[in-house]
Amino acid sequence: MRLLLDWLIGWPERVSRHLTWLGPLFARFTVGWVFLWSGWGKLNNLPQVTENFVGWGIPFPHVLTPLTSGIEFFGGLFLLLGLLTRISAGALGVTMIVAIKAAKWGDVDSLETLLGFDEFEYLALFLWLAIAGPGRVSLDAPISRWLARQPPSP
């Protein structure tokens, strides 16, 4: 029994210790790529996206459309680089909350429906990245190591 449990639990645990960098990297690359291009598309089609924001009842659409588009583009870029990861993931998470409330909330009739939205899945991933951080394979990692070696500010 011990051998079976070691094979089913212990061995995968030992292997995964060497791959802790892969989860955050894969998550950052996946959503970073999606939002880099989503933001780019919105930035290059602001009039149409602004009309969509008006139709969804989002206040100040002429301000929030370029702001949201920029958050998506630069947030995606920063996630790809692993730079300012927690801030970028937090900003993109807030964007997903607004997207759900503004464009999808009327379609929610159950928890299953809410959890099935792409925006909710992105929100979960952004929350994880904001809490867990970018991982070792990121630009944030050497900056964090450098900051740790600096004397405390007066």
Language-model-derived ranges and their functions:
Residues 1-44, 62-70, 74-154:
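Extended, low-polarity transmembrane helix blocks
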Residues 46-58, 86:
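Short juxtamembrane and helix-loop transition motifs at transmembrane-helix boundaries
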